[in-house]
Amino acid sequence: AVVKARVTKYNLGAAALPKMGANGRSLRRVLVVGQVEDDASVRLGTSTVSTNLGLLTVAANAHPGAEIIYKPHPDVEAGLRPGAIVPEDLQNLASVVASHADPLALIEACDEVWTMTSLLGFEALLRGKPVVCLGAPFYAGWGLTRDLGPVPDRRRRAPDGHPLPRPDLIHLVHAVLISYPRYFDPVSRRPCPPEVVVVRLAHGPLPVPSLRLRLLAKLQGIFA
C-alpha cells in the first residue's frame, strides 16, 4: 500500500527531476544520497566512510563510466547543517547534482542507490532497487543490501554464536512499519493502524500540527 500510494517519509512537494542521460540511457545510473554529517545515524552508524565526499568518491570509483546522480540533503543545501561538498569535487565526481529533486522520482529513475545510513536506502528497497550501504542503518546486515561497511554482529549471530535466519523484505517491512511503530491519526486524534496513516498521507490535506508537536519536532532535530 505504501508503494502503490507513493507515500514516503519525504511526503513533500519537490522540484522536477534535473536533466539526466545526456550520454544516452544505456549508461548505468547510480543515485548517491547525501546526508547531514553530524546526524546521529552517521556519527554512530559509520566507520570507514562518514562524509558525503567520501561516499560520493567511493561510489564514483566503483562505477567508472556510469551516470552518478548526487542528491544533497535539503538541510545541507540550505546551509543549516554540515555536509556540503565543494563545487570542484562535485564537478569531478558527479554527473548530475539533483538539488531539491523529488527523492521518490530519483529512486525510480536510477538503477542502484548508494548511501551511508539514509532512510532513502530503505525507500529504495521497498521499490526493488539494489542498495549499497557504507554504514549500518537498520535495514543493513540482513542480506537485503550490499554492505561495504561493518554491521553489528547481533544482526547475523545469536548470543550463543549460532547464525540467525535471514529475514526477507516482507518480514523487515512488517517489523519496521507495523510491529514497532505506534500511529496517531491527525484527523480523529486517536491511535490508528498503519493503513489509516497511508490513506491520510496519500489523500491529505492534513491538519496543521499543534504548537506542542512543532516544538517537539524542533527538539528532535536538535538532538538527532
Residue map of PLM features:
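Leloir-type glycosyltransferase catalytic cores
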Residues: 1-24, 144-224
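Short loop/turn segments at strand-loop or loop-helix junctions that form parts
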Residues: 27-39, 72-73, 136
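Short, solvent-exposed loop/turn segments at secondary-structure junctions
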Residues: 39-41, 78-79
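Mid-to-C-terminal functional-domain signal that highlights helix-capping/loop sites
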Residues: 40-55
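Short secondary-structure boundary/capping segments
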Residues: 46-49, 84-87, 129-131, 146-150
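Catalytic donor nucleotide-activated moiety binding site of glycosyltransferases and closely related
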Residues: 56-99
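A donor-sugar binding/catalytic signature common to diverse glycosyltransferases
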Residues: 100-145
